[in-house]
Amino acid sequence: MTSTYTSNTSIQQDNKIATLINVFTVEPKNQQHLVDLLIEATEKVMSQQEGFISANIHKSLDGTRVVNYAQWKSGEDFEKMLKNPRAIIHMNAALSIAKADGSLYKVVFVDNLAK
């Protein structure tokens, strides 16, 4: 499964959004399957939830990690999604093949060439 989208992700310091950074540890043989599960969850469930802004899935070159960098309008919107039965099904599928370490973050510094 490969999807190509233009991202709505904008990283700005001191904005009011909630940023989820979720690092999954996975066996290399399961890395692409996990990526596919996360993309499917995003397309079918997460993107339909109130407050969802964007999700960006990254996979490590050594095959042992997958990172989901997602943005939500608020922490409350993110917490509400966690209680959605459809979201729980997708999260459990991912957790059946990987260990997750996720937290919500606030951007405090950004530096780029386009100043």
Predicted regions and their residues:
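Short, surface-exposed ligand-recognition loops at beta-strand->loop->(often short) alpha-helix junctions
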Residues: 25-38
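Residue-identity detector for glutamine
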Residues: 12-13, 31-32, 48-49, 71
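Short, well-ordered beta-strand segments in beta-rich or mixed alpha/beta enzyme
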Residues: 17-25, 54-84
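Glycine-rich beta-strand-turn "strand-cap" elements at beta-sheet edges
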Residues: 1-18, 56-64, 90-115
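An amphipathic, aromatic/His-enriched active-site/gating alpha helix that lines ligand/cofactor pockets
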Residues: 2, 41-53, 71-106
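Non-catalytic surface loops within mature trypsin-like serine protease
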Residues: 26-28, 74, 109-111
